[in-house]
UniProtKB/Swiss-Prot annotation:
Active site (UniProt): D324
Protein name: Potassium-transporting ATPase ATP-binding subunit
Positions with a binding annotation for Mg(2+): D535, D539
Quaternary state and interactors: The system is composed of three essential subunits: KdpA, KdpB and KdpC.
Annotated catalysed reactions: K(+)(out) + ATP + H2O = K(+)(in) + ADP + phosphate + H(+)
Membrane topology recorded in Swiss-Prot or TrEMBL: Multi-pass membrane protein
EC number in record: 7.2.2.6
Binding positions for ATP per the UniProt entry: D361, E365, F393, K394, A395, E396, T397, R398, M399, S400, K412
Length: 697
């Protein structure tokens, strides 16, 4: 009997292995295609109209053109051999190509994602309901905002919209990558649907909320392709500083011949070009665009759609995070934690009636009561409950239960509501009911009273469990200097208990959606940058007010339009990871800038002695690396300057490993690694290259 089972398992495992192998092969093929395309784009980007957008690399390209021209214009006054000019020009060409390759590679990853998104934008037709009730089939491209469309099982949702009738399971894997379908229904915060997703069961009627070219997928394609990418304020500021440095060094190099003529010797033009390229920050200049694009790419890979690079950078500077309790800090499903009998009742009696009141209750709380009673092996008569008439929970009554066929009425619900119900039937209230209810509230739980007719048997302790690891994550945020504020509709007692258990810094109890705006503004008035999550229409104003607003993809259109980031997985806790990605982006840019500028120190010690030693013998003292000759020193510095760019591409694309710590500790760590390392690595690299170059000249 066991053999068929074993064979079946083996086949399943083999098919899974083959599927994984296919995915790996596809990923490798995609990577090869991206690299091949990036190599082609490296040459296409040599167009001066494109290069001028990066002033640093544009200067290098001009240097390449000058030295290339000099290679074909022999001069009797030149102090360097003819091959030197062509060698310098080739090194400068590869320097520009490597920088272009870094940018094209980052862009290529985005375009690959865009291509996969375009797969969902096939020729889709929609069943439009006209004003007279007729149903007409039209192309999705002809849909306009306000059109009413019916989508049946197996059909593609033609454009973004909101469900106004019906309920259906929707496959959103084309957008989110998650294979499990999600429920979409009319009303509430889960009525929003996205064009390109598919209805897998039932039928829904939707109202279109976007015109062609304005849909969610259109925005995603535009963003990941980089068409809508604008440089962030920090990126612009850094680019301005680097361009200013380049201009200063350009003036220095251009005026240098005046100084050397005064000393009685001349410097060859190719050497001056080499000096300029070694002086300007070419490393960070060549990688700056790639770092920004890769930062957006990392967020996208995390299934978060950032509406701009500014939003990602702002996430890295966040000081305060506003978090909802339910679904973010806690699981959001209150589960039966324990049973508390009152008066002279027993736990078996409480469990029996609690279970009977919950047999027909399909809510998570009702299911958890049944599961708890079963785990405690408490017996109850399920059959009499199933034969009874279920009384659903209502906001007015604040309780639910079942009316049995023999006339017995079983109820469970809010303390005050059940006490009032029992008293209306002439029942007496045990003295310890309120005492035990307060005890449950103090521990952060929710008390439900169980009563049968005019008699209270006890309480159900419902507990909304804090998600595992939240305290540790909040501690990491605290180390990063980020304050966490929990907003909840719970009473202050329950809120304080949950806040203490989770480890948040502050909490706001009995918080209404409009109160969140006040909390955000109060933090911003202190000069803080604030992040928050939300999914409902009532969250939209606060999402718009926050510096980083992360909306859930399952939420309303209003929430997604107000936010500057959208989480495709609809996981509110992801805001913590988004902050980490933002900090990683800022750190990567800062660290590579530090490394690039520190690099120049070693290049100075290589190229400056090589230029001036013949005229000023005392400059030989600066040749601390003992390089072979002036020409080999210049070429070695240029070669290192070129090859360091492709060597740093993986770091620019992946980002620097980020560990939560204080700003001062982070600064010290990066200065040690990328500042000191930026000085040491070029000394070693230039010396090794010089030893190799010295063998050929």
């Amino acid at each position: 009997m066991m053999r068929p089972v074993v064979v079946k398992e083996k086949r399943v495992n083999e098919s899974q292995i083959h599927a994984v192998e296919d995915e790996v092969r596809q990923a490798k093929t995609m990577d090869r295609d991206i690299v091949t395309h990036a190599m082609k784009q490296s040459f296409a980007k040599l167009n001066p109209k494109v290069m001028i957008k990066n002033p640093i690399m544009f200067v290098v390209e001009i240097g390449f053109i000058i030295t290339l021209i000099l290679s074909f214009l022999p001069s009797s006054s030149s102090s360097v051999p003819g091959w030197f000019n062509i060698t310098v020009s080739l090194i400068l060409l590869f320097t520009v190509l490597f920088a272009n390759f870094a940018e094209a590679l980052a862009e290529g990853r985005g375009k690959a994602q865009a291509d996969s998104l375009k797969q969902s934008k096939k020729d889709v037709f929609a069943n439009v309901v006209k004003e007279n009730g007729d149903i007409v089939q039209v192309s999705a491209t002809d849909l306009r905002k306000g059109d009413i469309v019916i989508v049946k099982q197996g059909e593609m949702i033609p454009n973004d919209g909101e469900v106004i009738k019906g309920l259906a399971s929707v496959d959103e894997s084309a957008i989110t990558g998650e294979s499990a379908p999600v429920i979409k229904e009319a009303g509430g915060d889960f009525c929003s649907v996205t064009g390109g997703t598919m209805v897998v069961s039932d039928e829904i009627t939707i109202v279109i909320t976007s015109n062609p070219g304005e849909s969610f997928i259109d925005k995603m394609i535009s963003l990941v392709e980089g068409a809508a990418r604008q440089k962030t304020p920090n990126e612009i500021a850094l680019n301005t500083v680097l361009t200013s440095l380049t201009l200063i060094f350009l003036i220095v190099v251009v005026t240098l011949p005046i100084f050397t003529n005064y000393l009685g010797f001349q410097i060859d033009t190719a050497v001056l070009v080499a000096l300029l390229v070694c002086l300007i920050p070419t490393t960070i200049g060549g990688l700056l665009s790639a770092i920004g694009i890769a930062g957006m790419d990392r967020v996208t890979k995390f299934n978060v759609l950032a509406m701009s690079g500014k939003a990602v950078e702002a996430a890295g500077d966040i000081n305060t995070i506003i978090l909802d309790k339910t679904g973010t800090i806690t699981f959001g499903n209150r589960m039966a934690h324990t049973l508390l009998p009152v008066g002279n009742e027993t736990i078996e009696q409480v469990g029996k009636w609690a279970a009977i009141s919950s047999v027909l209750d399909e809510t998570p709380e009702g299911r958890s009561v049944i599961e708890y009673v079963q785990t405690k092996s408490i017996s109850y008569n399920r059959e009499i409950a199933e034969q009874g008439e279920f009384v659903p929970f209502k906001a007015e009554t604040r309780m639910s239960g079942v009316d049995l066929q023999d006339g017995t009425k079983v109820r469970k619900g809010a303390v005050g509501a059940v006490i009032e119900w029992v008293q209306s039937q002439g029942g007496m209230i045990p003295k310890d009911v309120n005492q035990k209810a307060d005890l449950i509230s103090k521990e952060g739980g929710t008390p439900l009273v169980v009563a049968v007719d005019n008699r209270i048997y006890g309480l159900i302790y419902l507990k909304d469990t804090v998600k595992p690891g939240m305290r540790e994550r909040f501690e990491q945020l605290r180390q990063m200097g980020i304050k966490t504020v929990m907003c909840t509709g719970d009473n202050p007692l329950t809120a304080a208990t949950i806040a203490k258990e989770a480890g948040v810094d502050e909490f706001v109890a009995e918080c209404k959606p409009e109160d969140k705006i006040a909390v955000i503004k109060a933090e911003q008035d202190k000069g803080k940058l604030v992040a928050m999550t939300g999914d409902g229409t009532n969250d939209a104003p606060a999402l718009a007010q926050a510096d980083v607003g992360l909306a859930m993809n399952s939420g309303t259109t209003a929430a997604k339009e107000a936010a500057n980031m959208i989480d495709l997985d609809s996981n509110p806790t992801k805001i913590i990871e988004v902050v980490g990605i933002g900090k990683q982006l800022l750190m990567t840019r800062g660290a590579l800038t530090t490394f690039s500028i520190a690099n120049d120190i070693a290049k100075y010690f290589a190229i400056i002695p090589a230029m001036f030693t013949l005229a000023i013998p005392q400059m030989e003292a600066l040749n601390i690396m003992k390089l072979t000759s002036p020409l080999s020193a210049i070429l070695s510095a240029l070669i290192f300057n070129a090859v360091i760019i492709p060597l740093l591409i993986p770091l620019a694309m992946k980002g620097i490993a980020y560990k939560p710590m204080s700003s001062n500790a982070l600064l010290s760590r990066n200065l040690l690694i990328y500042g000191l390392g930026g000085v040491i690595v070029p000394f070693i690299g230039i010396k090794v290259i010089d030893m190799i170059v010295g063998l050929f000249i």
